[in-house]
């Protein structure tokens, strides 16, 4: 394939709530850009982008498939790398990874549902990574569709600056096409060619006034970003050319100052080509984004790399997937330099050189082999032995570490065991591979029971993992009931002297420390251990201080109540003493671990549980039952709003421990008419009576409460 100029490359993702039609829109993009000859429908389970079996069965997208496609716009052929991202909240990690490596995004909304809870989460994630966006309001053919209401919600809920650049012609079942406010023409799609052909006509007479009004608002908004346009706008708006509007809108979009708004109905094949045109027109190319910044692992100095093939290589591995035919595929984005098939590349985390045996550009899950992937491009490689999500790949002569990604900690765990003992190895091998692919999924062995416990972001997340074990690794599992990932905390400050002595002939062990242990300071935000060394006059030699710190850090993994990790703690090392012969680093480490156990038991230990932020959309008549049920689940209702389809939105904070099987219960209460979505919010202290019950169940020490 011919090499595309970098300014004609677009690395984009489609981000949205579940069911806003992300995958259907991606399918249409592939159809119109000529990559698929038959359109895949999500509800038939045949969508090209949803290539895992579970996705096709459940009709949701779990892994971000990356696809490369081309589109002609304004005389040039653009190369579009399209990343389809999941909208289900349990798979937030996938979204976070995709946004890290994109240059721009299309935020898709449902014309009926508008800005939904997950849309808000994803919007904030895109803000965090400075990803410019255009918005696409889908499902304009559905009853209750209202384009301008979604524009209003984007402003109110997301605090965005939406700028409609189209006006729909008709709505609901009469939705026929769009008025393009930049060209001031009407576009109608032909149903007989599945929307592949369309006609451009004059604006219908009954829409001329509305179109002029919205065009005027659009010009007023973009004039702020272009001085020449501003003058024309005040002198004579009719002299403003299409090129000037496009240039001003592009600048404003790339600076994240406005969000151009389009609409359509992907399922009914209307509006997708206009969306593709404006993806090319407004979203940034790799050259429009800032140079990527990383640190040199040898010197710690900051370095930046330009998006050019002549620079030293730097690339970020953003996803690892196991493919049945080629084995482990590593998806990466090349920021500078290039990666060639058959060459060696250095992994700055592991410090090892790896050979990239083959390179591919992906079309959903089919691979097209390529020889080289250059700066600004996205591709996948085979042949890496030791690689994790977030690793930087670079030249050995010019190592660099790009900023990696932070992922939330898992909140729910279940114990699993294979149905037959002989599958034990298969199970651990399968779990290890899945944990490599997904940073929000962890596997550990419970020290007390010896069970294997897998943890993830929610029930659906773990269901899919168990399902994949069965399909991909042929392991059938028995699973325990879900467990909540509790934490522990201390509430009081305690002073303590701990002496550790061991004399068993020959050299003994000796350490003596005086510490103050308590909750962290309010301004200490990062969690973990806040360690302060106040030892004067060398009473404890400098080389033993890190061992004391290490002892406390490792001890915090097991709380005194039931062995749950302690989230944060402040330790002030005040004084102590040592023995010139018997003291060593290990003595001080063990002494710190003992001090931790003794002090925490007296420091008012409490149990902390994960609290979830819940939103339920329910019909008015079921509202009382839904709230009554939440009260039974120890929920705190924080607010209620009306949605425009006559339903009510209930927002509440509810402990995760009370939420198992909630989806089924909600279905029963509302006869299947309500929907809910849940995101982890924070950990909060559990009341004494509930803490006692939890501790008795896990055989913890309820006597310390």
Curated annotation (Swiss-Prot):
Its main location: cytoplasm. The gene is fusA. InterPro entries: EFG_II, EFG_III, EFG_III/V, EFG_IV, EFG_V, EFG_V-like, EFTu-like_2, G_TR_CS. It is found in: Cytoplasm. PROSITE patterns: G_TR_1 (PS00301), G_TR_2 (PS51722). Transmembrane segments: none annotated. GO terms for molecular function: GTP binding; GTPase activity; translation elongation factor activity. CDD domains: EF-G (cd01886), EFG_III (cd16262), EFG_mtEFG1_IV (cd01434), EFG_mtEFG_C (cd03713), EFG_mtEFG_II (cd04088). It comes from Bacteroides thetaiotaomicron (strain ATCC 29148 / DSM 2079 / JCM 5827 / CCUG 10774 / NCTC 10582 / VPI-5482 / E50). GO terms for cellular component: cytoplasm. It comes from the Bacteria. NCBIfam families: EF-G (TIGR00484), PRK12740.1-5 (NF009381), small_GTP (TIGR00231). This is Elongation factor G. Keywords: Cytoplasm, Elongation factor, GTP-binding, Nucleotide-binding, Protein biosynthesis. Belongs to the TRAFAC class translation factor GTPase superfamily. Classic translation factor GTPase family. EF-G/EF-2 subfamily. GTP binds at residues 16-23, 84-88, 138-141. Residues 7-287 form the tr-type G domain. Pfam families: EFG_C (PF00679), EFG_III (PF14492), EFG_IV (PF03764), GTP_EFTU (PF00009), GTP_EFTU_D2 (PF03144). One of its GO terms (biological process) is ribosome disassembly. Catalyzes the GTP-dependent ribosomal translocation step during translation elongation. During this step, the ribosome changes from the pre-translocational (PRE) to the post-translocational (POST) state as the newly formed A-site-bound peptidyl-tRNA and P-site-bound deacylated tRNA move to the P and E sites, respectively. Catalyzes the coordinated movement of the two tRNA molecules, the mRNA and conformational changes in the ribosome.
């Amino acid at each position: 394939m011919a090499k595309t100029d970098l300014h004609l490359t677009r690395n984009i993702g489609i981000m949205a709530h579940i069911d806003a039609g992300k995958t259907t829109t991606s399918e249409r993009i592939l159809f119109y850009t000529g990559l698929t000859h038959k359109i895949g429908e999500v509800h038939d389970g045949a969508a090209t982008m949803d290539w895992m079996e579970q996705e096709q069965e459940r009709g949701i997208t779990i892994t971000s498939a990356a696809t490369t496609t081309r589109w002609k716009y304004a005389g040039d052929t653009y190369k579009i790398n399209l990343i389809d991202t999941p909208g289900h909240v349990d798979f937030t990690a996938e979204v976070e990874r995709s946004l890290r490596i994109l240059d721009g995004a299309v935020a898709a909304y449902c014309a009926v549902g508008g800005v939904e809870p997950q849309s808000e989460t994803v919007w904030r994630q895109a803000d965090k990574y400075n990803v410019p966006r255009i918005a696409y309001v889908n499902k304009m053919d559905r009853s209750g569709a209202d384009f301008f209401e979604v524009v209003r919600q984007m402003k109110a809920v997301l605090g965005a600056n939406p700028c409609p650049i189209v006006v729909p012609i008709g709505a609901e079942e009469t939705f026929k096409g769009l008025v393009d406010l930049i060209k001031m023409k009407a576009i109608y799609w032909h149903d007989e060619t599945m929307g592949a052909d369309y006609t451009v006509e004059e604006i219908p007479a009954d829409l001329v006034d509305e179109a002029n009004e919205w065009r005027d608002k659009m010009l007023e908004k973009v004039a702020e970003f272009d001085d020449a346009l501003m003058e024309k706008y005040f002198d004579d708006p009719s002299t403003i050319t299409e090129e000037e509007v496009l240039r001003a809108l592009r600048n404003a979009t790339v600076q994240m100052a406005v969000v151009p708004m389009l609409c359509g109905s992907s399922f009914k094949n209307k509006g997708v080509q206009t969306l593709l045109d404006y993806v090319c027109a407004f979203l940034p190319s790799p050259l429009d984004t800032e140079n990527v910044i990383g640190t040199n692992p040898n010197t710690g100095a900051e370095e930046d790399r330009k998006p050019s093939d002549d620079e030293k290589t730097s690339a970020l591995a953003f996803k690892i997937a196991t493919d049945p035919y080629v084995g482990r595929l590593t998806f990466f984005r090349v920021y500078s330099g290039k990666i060639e098939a058959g060459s060696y590349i250095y992994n700055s985390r592991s410090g090892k050189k790896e050979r990239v045996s083959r390179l591919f550009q992906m079309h959903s899950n089919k691979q097209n082999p390529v020889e080289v992937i250059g700066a600004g491009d996205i591709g996948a490689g085979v042949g890496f032995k030791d690689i994790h999500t977030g690793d930087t790949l670079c030249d050995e002569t010019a190592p660099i570490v790009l900023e990696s990604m932070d992922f939330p900690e898992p909140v729910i765990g279940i114990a699993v065991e294979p149905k037959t003992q002989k599958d034990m190895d298969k199970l651990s091998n399968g779990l290890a591979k899945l944990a490599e692919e997904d940073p929000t999924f962890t596997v550990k062995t419970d020290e007390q029971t010896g069970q294997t416990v897998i943890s993830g972001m929610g029930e659906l997340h773990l269901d899919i993992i168990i399902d994949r074990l069965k399909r991909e690794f042929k392991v059938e599992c028995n699973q325990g009931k879900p467990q909540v990932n509790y934490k522990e905390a201390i509430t009081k400050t305690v002073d303590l002297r701990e002496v550790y002595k061991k004399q068993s002939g020959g050299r003994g062990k000796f350490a003596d420390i005086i510490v103050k242990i308590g909750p962290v300071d309010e301004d200490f935000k990062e969690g973990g251990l806040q360690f302060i060394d106040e030892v004067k006059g060398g009473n404890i030699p400098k080389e033993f201080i890190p061992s004391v710190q290490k002892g406390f850090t490792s001890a915090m993994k097991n709380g005194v109540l039931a062995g749950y990790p302690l989230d944060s703690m402040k330790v002030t090392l005040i004084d102590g003493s040592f023995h010139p012969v018997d003291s060593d680093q290990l003595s001080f480490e063990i002494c710190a671990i003992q001090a931790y156990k003794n002090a925490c038991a007296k420091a008012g230990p409490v149990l902390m549980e994960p609290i979830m932020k819940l939103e339920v959309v329910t019909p008015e008549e079921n509202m009382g039952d839904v709230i009554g049920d939440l009260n039974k689940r120890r929920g705190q209702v924080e607010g209620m709003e009306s949605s425009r389809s006559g339903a009510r939105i209930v927002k509440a904070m509810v402990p995760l421990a009370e939420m198992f099987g909630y989806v089924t219960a909600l279905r029963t209460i509302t006869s299947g008419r309500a929907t809910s979505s849940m995101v982890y919010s924070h950990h909060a202290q559990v009341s004494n009576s509930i803490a006692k019950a939890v501790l008795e169940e896990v055989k913890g020490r309820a006597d310390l409460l």
